[in-house]
Amino acid sequence: MREYVLIFLVAPVFAAILGPYDIPPELPPLNDENFFDRSHSEYETVLTPEDFELGTRITAAMAHDNGDDIWDSDAMYSKDRFEGDIANDNLNASTAELFANGGSGKSEDGKWYNAIKNRLQLWPEGRIPYTISSQYSSYSRSLIAASMQEYASHTCIRWVPKEAADVNYVHIYPDRGCYSMVGKMGGKQSLSLGSGCIQKGIILHELMHAVGFFHEQSRTDRDDHITIMWNNIQAGMQGQFEKYGHGTIQSLGTGYDYGSIMHYGTKAFSRNGQPTMIPKKNGATIGQRNGFSKVDKFKINTLYGCPVEGEKPTTSAPTSGPIVITVKPVVITTGKPPVIQTVSPAVPLKPSECRNLRGDCDDLAKQGWCIRNPGWMRANCPISCGMCIPTKETQKPYVQTTTQAATTTARPQKPVTQPIQPLPPVPPLPPTTPEDCEDLRVDCLVLVSQRYCKISQNFMKSYCAKSCGFCFKPPPTEIPDNRPTVVTTRPLVTLPPAVIRSRSPAPPVSTTTKAAPTTSTTSAAPYSPTPLPSECSDRKHFCSHWKSAGFCEGIFMNYMKKNCPASCGLC
């Protein structure tokens, strides 16, 4: 049954990624090969901006499925792990209290909930360094990126790429099944997203374990809200349905949440296909894997001392969708001397609109993405790029030397969290051709230092060809022209006769023609404006969309120059 649901969900996703002109005749079979390749050499890497862009489009495509992404996976219910997917060593119902805080106690209302109490097991300032296995496919990386984006959008939890100074971090890799440790355990801790786990709701679930949460149905007050059908539980698995004792978990002032993404499904550990848990509230459903409930968001923000969003949302208005602005000179060619009209620099964002939507914005700014793709960074990381009107509540951005001075502001003690609308889908990424020979990953230099140019040549030729020195330029077939080339930052323009005659001619190309910097003319022919070259036209359907998304600059500039020169003004 799960395979049919997957086909229903993924079909529109492939259509959204490929576009209306590139839909394949039939989808590939949905198996593990679509999600990861365990035969590939395994090493630690991080997500890229392209993963987050693709994740946004996949999420938008799935939104058209009317929220039917609710199926629960058997991969979450391992007989060998505590409660099916908790990987902490020697953790069970009898040791959970000792694990959480080593003592006993009682909340004010006598109830215990599902967050750890020991503050040492929380991630400092909500910053969670991570690495991700190189074995995941682009589709899987994008869903993981979309899930991390959910945390950045609704909580102050920031999943950030691991840095050299980070000793404690989460490594995500495709082991057998789905599992995670609860909270920060110290050092490198594993989080598995293997077979049956590449689904956004399950990814959110496992990441929330790492944030510091147990399952909802293990609360002390759970018997007031659900009925456990003990006769339907697999033999020996009754211990997976124990409740936590006093002193084990944190009181966060919330009622029982049937809709929590941390709740078991109705048939967890079932021996006969019948429900093992039944809600006592009429019409309530459990085990949803659509996304955070309002209470989930409230609990995460409360546990980490963030401005609260969720069950008690803030009253600030949501921001509008990101506006991608590409500043390009506009050239008007007439019979008069040319007039260059330039668009004024992008207006700094208002404080109400200025918020980093990703946890790794500072890292991306340091890697130069504010310059390489300013449109995308303005929409996702305006604070880090200094694109905001300075206020006391604005974080300190990473300051770069650009044509527009960055605004330096003060970093607050705690990030300001505001509810926002889901990001709109972005246009498809332009494909990268081998002849462009550009690095397509931001961590290429790191991979080069780890000798992957030798041990994984095929992978590095595809993603880090420039850093590895795999770029190939064919020998010239014509005699090169050694005359100096004038490089200008302004587009080619056609000049009137008076301006042309005032310029000194370039060295003659033939006995009958004289070359000028921008216009060719003969001594006998009357003046006429030189038309644009016939090949200066867009060759792709999505050129205008790619331009508005900022792809005329950065790593895709060579591709856009070849395929979308008219839209990008690169003729």
Curated annotation (Swiss-Prot):
What this protein needs as a cofactor is: Zn(2+)
Q: Which SMART domains match?
A: ShKT (SM00254), ZnMc (SM00235)
SUPFAM superfamilies linked: Metalloproteases ('zincins'), catalytic domain
Task: Fetch the Gene3D superfamilies from UniProt.
Answer: 1.10.10.1940, Collagenase (Catalytic Domain) (3.40.390.10)
What is the main EC category here? hydrolase
Tagged with keyword rRNA-binding: no
Q: What are the annotated disulfide bridges?
A: C156-C306, C178-C197, C354-C388, C361-C381, C370-C385, C437-C471, C444-C464, C453-C468, C536-C571, C543-C564, C552-C568
Tissue localization of expression: Expressed in pharyngeal marginal cells and muscles.
Q: Which GO terms describe its cellular component?
A: extracellular region
Recorded GO molecular functions are: metalloendopeptidase activity; zinc ion binding
Which ranges form a coiled coil? none
Q: Domain ShKT, which positions?
A: 354-388, 437-471, 536-571
The entry's localization annotation reads: Secreted
Q: InterPro entries, from UniProt?
A: Astacin-like_dom (IPR034035), MetalloPept_cat_dom_sf (IPR024079), Peptidase_M12A (IPR001506), Peptidase_Metallo (IPR006026), ShKT_dom (IPR003582)
Q: Which residues form the signal peptide?
A: 1-15
Q: How is the cofactor bound?
A: Binds 1 zinc ion per subunit.
Instruction: Indicate the segments forming the Peptidase M12A domain, all copies.
Output: 114-307
> Which keywords does the record carry?
Disulfide bond, Glycoprotein, Hydrolase, Metal-binding, Metalloprotease, Protease, Repeat, Secreted, Signal, Zinc, Zymogen
GO biological process terms held by the UniProt record = proteolysis
Q: Where is the composition biased (Low complexity)?
A: 407-420, 509-527
| Described function | Metalloprotease.
The protein's name: Zinc metalloproteinase nas-15
What is the species listed in this Swiss-Prot or TrEMBL entry? Answer: Caenorhabditis elegans
